[in-house]
Amino acid sequence: YISPATREAVYAIYYDELRRKIEDRGTTNFPEAAGRKLYGELTMIITVNHTGGVLDTEIVQTSGNNLLDRRAQAIVRSLAFGQFNDGMRRQADQIVVVSRFRFTREDGLQTQLSSQP
């Protein structure tokens, strides 16, 4: 288990790519219901395996809108994040990322990765 607080460059690059992929997909496929965009904030724990596949997503702080929470999970599950490089693989089989999602009118989806929910 390696948290985003890890300062090694190899992990920093991977976490930045993970964050950008989530934001790009979430902004492109912004959650909607009945033709109206859904806005809010939530916190999700994401578990990624060494092949870059998403093993699990768990909402630890809801947006208050179950549909938005489910759509955020679907965005993450639809992605592949790339295989761990050799340095990462020697240290971990999977990583657990705590991510704060902000779906906003102005900026689309913004995420912030941390090691604490």
Where would I find each of the regions flagged by the language model?
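Surface-exposed patches in mature extracellular/periplasmic domains of secreted proteins
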Residues: 30-35, 87
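Intrinsic disorder
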Residues: 5, 9-13
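Conserved "boundary/linchpin" sites in short secondary-structure elements
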Residues: 1-5, 20-27, 49-61, 73-84, ...
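Short, small/polar residue-rich loop motifs at catalytic or cofactor-binding pockets
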Residues: 37-42
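Stable alpha-helical elements in mature extracytoplasmic
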Residues: 14, 18, 68-72
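Alpha-helical promoter-recognition and RNA polymerase-docking modules of transcription initiation factors
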Residues: 12-15, 31
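A short acidic/small-residue loop/turn micro-motif
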Residues: 61-67
